[in-house]
Amino acid sequence: MIHSKPTRNLALDLVRVTEAAALAAGRFMGRGDKNAADKASVDAMRLVLNEVEMDGIIVIGEGEKDEAPMLYNGEHLGTGEPPQVDIAVDPIDGTRPLAHGQYNSLSTVALSPRGTMFNPGPFVYMNKIAVGPEARDVIDIDASVEDNLKAVARAKGMDVNDVTVVILDRPRHEKLISEVRRLGARIRLIPDGDVAGALMTSMPETGIDILMGIGGTPEGVLAACALRCLGGNMQGKIYPRNDVERQKGIELGYDLDKVLKLEDLVSSEDTFFAATGITGGELLHGVSYTGAGATTDSIVMRGLTGTVRRIMAQHRFAKLSRISAINY
């Protein structure tokens, strides 16, 4: 018989955070105003994060304090009570798709024990490779595209031409895309939102087998937290945008040649992750508004137990307005 009581699942607190941000941001779908959408989601996310019983510090936020008035790197959030945690936030992963009324924008947040989350410092981008549980032990970011695709195909009992690779649609990936095509693998190009792309590698129903390419470091850490929960794997390498960023990183002590393994990106298994869809996509449905309120679709997970929940929630604005300062 198990006598110790269950520990608290902070992921269930986090889903209220991402729901609030998604509900606030969803009003701006297709309206062409990224800044207004971002402000609405940041305001809502910060308000609800401050209600969570935790002593949190933002490691992955909206930028440095002089660049971001709220949810900035180093900001303290929560009630100040234990547990002490690192926080990674992306109120809108995919601001451009949201502003243009396109698919695959999400609101995401992750927590892990204090000092366990990788701090990317000045670096905005990293090279990434991510896979699901079946191929978790076979990837190597320093190996060739061909070697990685063949290794993933073998691990999953597939031919290379059955493998589907998700890649951000950017000019910098022209060579990568050409190589994947040469090898005969399938490609899913996404305009933004590689957090969703990384998660889909661990969800067989999406048909995605591997994520490759250069994307944001904040999204990389958030994805790593989720993959810790899902049993997948990820590797990354810092990708300086220019010589100034490279030199600054060296001065701060970063090893630019180091392969960042999943355990380097988030060193604790006791991690929590939540995401709520803003605009619809393959991972989550978007916010759907009615005359009385809205419906949200979220995924929440906990690394310690491996439990993954899907939460479809109905929100009634007339009742919410009595207890919430957020203008939905």
Feature annotation, model-predicted:
Residues 108, 113-189, 281-288, 294-324:
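Acidic beta-strand-loop-alpha-helix segment within the catalytic core
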Residues 58-62, 87-89, 98-100, 119-120, ...:
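General beta-strand structural signal in soluble alpha/beta enzymes
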Residues 185-195, 208-210, 214-215, 219-250, ...:
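Gly/Ser/Thr-rich active-site loops/lids in small-molecule metabolic enzymes
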Residues 82-93, 97-117:
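DPxDG-like acidic metal-binding loop motif
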